[in-house]
Curated annotation (Swiss-Prot):
Species lineage: Eukaryota, Metazoa, Chordata, Craniata, Vertebrata
UniProt region (LCN1-binding), positions on chain: 1-76
Cytoplasmic side: 43-66, 136-154, 218-305, 372-388, 453-489
Subunit structure: Dimer. Can also form higher oligomers. Interacts with LCN1; this interaction mediates the endocytosis of LCN1. Interacts with UBAC2, FAF2, VCP, AMFR, ZNRF3, CTNNB1, LRP6, GSK3A and GSK3B. Interacts with DVL2 and RNF43. Interaction with SCGB1A1 has been observed in PubMed:16423471, but not in PubMed:23964685. Interaction with LGB which mediates the endocytosis of LGB has been observed in PubMed:17991420, but not in PubMed:23964685.
Species name: Homo sapiens (Human)
GO CC terms: endoplasmic reticulum membrane; plasma membrane
Protein family (similarity comment): Belongs to the LIMR family.
Annotated protein name in UniProt: Protein LMBR1L
Length: 489
């Protein structure tokens, strides 16, 4: 064999080993996420749905739970996708020729983006509808009962739903795109219609993030205040403990002497209220035993960090709005190449990259808090060991929509300069200047409005409490009308 043949063979072997290495790394990453999500979901599922007398229902719920675990793992991978890419780029810049990080390259990052895009499509369009129809199915009338009968019914329902969605996407694309070939042909399903459908879903996710993130940024202050121990100047734990003990004693007296009240009592409701008060009293005892460092330093530092992160997010978006008006390069776009480690995506270098990662995670947590705080989705909020299977499916779908839109959301707001890889950069609406500009302006305006409203309401409540106006008796709404009637008489 000649020397050129050896060179060709060595290049092929190297490409083969790199491909195998990427597959192993991707599999290990997904397995880790899958195990974490499975542990997380088992803490919220209803144990009664998996230990029923009917083995068929238990089997169906177990299969649906595995599909939900897969979907939630993909959602978590979508959240980690952009931060992992930014950190990888900075690591390659700092250690360009290190032997121990040869596995970290542009091909691996690009492959992870493509896998997340593929499995997000698969979960949203096929797996989650299959899981929902599978849990609700009973088999066709006249067919034999069993899991296989449910599978047949679910597959038929899924095929009908696929045809319906495909027809709607075809009509929508024909209306938006005036190209006659797209109206007459359905052959380019994988190349055009499926990415177009995911583009619509991603756009809905970005709009959902636009609504939920400002609300979550405002709610983060109150949520953090409930989790941390406030200074004694801001809360009186002794008074709360006294009130809790007094209410518990009153409810216990009602339970022990039900004949003392002439109204019928709901004993089950009273027992639940007593248990809730006992749990609240235990939490208050723990908060009272907190150290002075936790009480006087932890809460102010946490509030200061939240205020800095929120203000920094609004400032970056405001700067990005000005850049959109001046420079066309500020528009979000896709990156087809896989070369990383060439240039930093932050003007501040590694420090700026760390700030970008922290802001991305902060906005994602805020969007989840805002999502579950909104009145429309509050009923979806999972409960510890008391969440139905259909509710778990709904939560997984919503979290996947939010997380898969996070890279587009971050790049649209200018939180990072890292361009979108793979099919994430092929969305049609990303090139529309008016959509991107209005989106940035709406985010900055809504976030500022929510923060101003939250802080003014908090300051107003503290002033009312400080002046003792909260102890004043409130006027009865019907009293003035009654006085007028007596005057006329």
């Amino acid at each position: 064999m000649e020397a050129p043949d050896y060179e060709v063979l060595s290049v092929r072997e190297q490409l083969f080993h790199e491909r195998i290495r990427e597959c192993i790394i991707s599999t290990l990453l997904f397995a880790t996420l899958y195990i974490l999500c499975h542990i997380f979901l088992t803490r919220f599922k209803k144990p009664a749905e998996f230990t029923t007398v009917d083995d068929e229902d238990a089997t169906v719920n177990k299969i649906a739970l595995e599909l939900c675990t897969f979907t939630l793992a993909i959602a978590l991978g979508a959240v980690l996708l952009l931060p992992f890419s930014i950190i990888s780029n900075e690591v390659l810049l700092s250690l360009p020729r290190n032997y121990y990080i040869q596995w970290l390259n542009g091909s691996l990052i690009h492959g992870l983006w493509n896998l997340v895009f593929l499995f997000s499509n698969l979960s949203l369009i096929f797996l989650m509808p299959f899981a929902y129809f599978f849990t609700e199915s009973e088999g066709f009338a006249g067919s034999r009962k069993g899991v296989l009968g449910r599978v047949y019914e679910t597959v038929v329902m899924l095929m009908l739903l696929t045809l319906l969605v495909l027809g709607m996407v075809w009509v929508a694309s024909a209306i938006v795109d005036k190209n006659k070939a797209n109206r007459e042909s359905l052959y380019d399903f994988w190349e055009y219609y499926l990415p177009y459908l995911y583009s619509c879903i991603s756009f809905l996710g970005v709009l959902l993030l636009l609504v939920c993130t400002p609300l979550g940024l405002a709610r983060m202050f109150s949520v953090t205040g409930k989790l941390l121990v406030k200074p004694r100047l801001l809360e009186d734990l002794e008074e709360q403990l006294y009130c809790s003990a007094f209410e518990e004693a009153a409810l216990t007296r009602r339970i022990c002497n039900p004949t003392s009240c002439w109204l019928p009592l709901d004993m089950e409701l009273l027992h639940r209220q007593v248990l809730a008060l006992q749990t609240q009293r235990v939490l208050l005892e723990k908060r009272r035993k907190a150290s002075a460092w936790q009480r006087n330093l932890g809460y102010p530092l946490a509030m200061l960090c939240l205020l800095v992160l929120t203000g920094l997010s609004v400032l970056i978006v405001a700067i990005h709005i000005l850049e959109l008006l001046i420079d066309e390069a500020a528009m979000p776009r896709g990156m087809q190449g896989t070369s990383l480690g060439q240039v930093s995506f932050s003007k501040l270098g590694s420090f700026g990259a760390v700030i970008q990662v922290v802001l991305i995670f902060y906005l994602m947590v805020s969007s989840v808090v805002g999502f579950y705080s909104s009145p429309l989705f509050r009923s979806l909020r999972p409960r510890w060991h008391d969440t139905a299977m259909t509710q778990i499916i709904g939560n997984c779908v919503c979290l996947l929509v939010l997380s898969s839109a996070l890279p587009v959301f971050s790049r649209t707001l200018g939180l990072t300069r890292f361009d979108l890889l793979g099919d994430f950069g092929r969305f049609n609406w990303l090139g529309n200047f008016y959509i991107v500009f209005l989106y940035n302006a709406a985010f900055a305006g809504l976030t500022t409005l929510c923060l101003v409203k939250t802080f003014t309401a908090a300051v107003r409540a503290e002033l009312i409490r400080a002046f003792g106006l909260d102890r004043l008796p409130l006027p009865v709404s019907g009293f003035p009308q009654a006085s007028r009637k007596t005057q006329h008489q």
